Amino acid sequence: MHLVGGGLSDDDTPLLARFLSEATTRATAAARLEPARVAVVLVHDGLGAEEFDRYAAALRSAGACEPFAVLAPEGGSFAVAQLQDVDGIVVGGGLTPAYRQALEPVFGEIRRQVTAGVPYAGFSAGAAVAAETAIVGGWRIGDVEVVQESASEDLDEVTVEQGIGLIDVAVDVHAAQWGTLTRLIAATEAGLVEGGVAIDEGTVLIVGEGQLVVEGRGSVWSVIGSETGVTVSSAGAS
């Protein structure tokens, strides 16, 4: 599983290299003759085709593959049939509550496929909703501001909802750029989540069977709760 702390940018193609390698391995194991089929899952506000073209170009720059679009408008939802016969799943960035709502009908299917070995890459919203307990937005807890309002995702109160369930800790994104590390710290202290990771833009956290791997130009911040408060640490690319 590959969790990227921001939406796709022009500098992010290298972050897709290991994901695409895993998808290619999956295609080979399935005896697929054509390149790896990668579902690009996007929730959009009218520019879905243009956004898909950006992701498809980045994937093809990272290696041979066959990206295909799985699109839903904000307020819509996805169906299990749209995610069949895939070697990799990319979930893009955008309004996190809209992504969570659209993906909810296929949470179980995505978990099933990832368990079966299909690699998952989430950018921004796609990383946040990968968690079992997902922070979908908000900038205040009660009357206390915990992050800048511009990071609220159109929500007032910090909101935690069921996510896909690919990782058992919360994930926040745009950590250094939007200051969302403080939201994760506050949510942990308030007992909304049991801890988690906050990922910088341009940075990917790779979660697999072995040791966690960080790649890219930023850091991944780990927040662990305890009876006496929280512990925060960071890790960069090694």
Task: Label the model's feature ranges.
Residues 1-33, 40-53, 57, 61, ...:
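C-terminal and late-domain segments of enzyme folds
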Residues 11, 99-100, 131, 138:
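Glycine/Thr-rich phosphate-binding loops of Rossmann-like dinucleotide-binding domains
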Residues 37, 87-88:
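Structural motif
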Residues 65-80:
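A short, well-structured beta->alpha microelement
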Residues 83-84, 114:
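A short, aliphatic-rich alpha-helical micro-motif
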Residues 90-92, 114-135:
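Catalytic nucleophile loop
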Residues 91-97, 169-171:
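Short, basic, glycine/proline-bearing loop/turn elements
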Residues 96-105:
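Glycine/threonine-rich flexible loop motifs
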